[in-house]
C-alpha cells in the first residue's frame, strides 16, 4: 500500500487526537499519547518514512509540551515538514482545526486501524507484526482514556 493511501488516515488520527483532546485532560494524556504516536510512527508501512518520523519526534520532549495548542502546533509543523520534503502543499493551521474538529474520532480511529494493519511485502513481515502489537496497545489505551476526548 503506497503512502498516499495509508498516510492520510494516520495524519487524520494524529490531528484529530490533538483537536479532540479535552483541554483539562492535557496534563494526564500528553505523555502516554505522545508515546503512542512515536510507536505508530516507528512502524509505518514505509521504513524510510518511519526513519524520518522517528528522527523528527525524537527531538521533542513531551514534558516540555505545555498545552493542547502547543501539541497541535507540533503536529502541524511535523506534517508540514513531511509535506515540504515530499514537495506537497503546506497546510494552513486554521484549515486543519476546522477540518479535524468535524471528524468523528471513532470513525477516524477505525480507518487508522484498517490501513495501519495492512500487510506489506514479505521483507516487512516483522514490521507488520509490530504494527499489530502497536494497534492492540493503542486501542486498549484509547478505550481506557476515551473520556479525555470529545
Predicted regions and their residues:
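Aromatic-rich, lipid-facing transmembrane alpha helices and their immediate juxtamembrane interface loops
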Residues: 1-150
Amino acid at each position: 500500500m503506497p503512502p498516499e493511501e495509508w498516510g492520510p488516515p494516520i495524519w487524520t488520527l494524529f490531528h484529530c487526537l490533538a483537536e479532540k483532546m479535552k483541554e483539562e485532560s492535557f496534563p494526564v494524556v500528553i505523555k502516554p499519547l505522545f508515546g503512542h504516536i512515536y510507536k505508530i510512527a516507528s512502524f509505518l508501512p514505509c521504513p524510510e518514512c518511519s526513519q524520518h518520523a522517528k528522527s523528527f519526534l525524537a527531538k521533542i520532549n513531551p514534558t516540555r509540551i505545555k498545552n493542547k495548542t502547543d501539541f497541535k502546533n507540533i503536529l502541524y509543523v511535523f506534517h508540514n515538514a513531511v509535506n515540504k520534503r515530499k514537495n506537497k502543499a503546506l497546510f494552513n493551521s486554521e484549515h486543519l482545526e476546522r477540518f479535524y474538529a468535524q471528524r468523528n474520532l471513532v470513525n477516524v480511529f477505525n480507518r487508522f486501524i484498517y490501513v495501519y494493519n495492512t500487510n506489506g511485502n514479505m521483507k516487512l513481515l516483522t514490521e507488520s507484526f509490530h504494527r499489530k502489537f502497536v494497534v492492540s496497545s493503542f486501542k486498549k489505551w484509547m478505550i481506557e482514556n476515551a473520556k479525555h476526548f470529545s
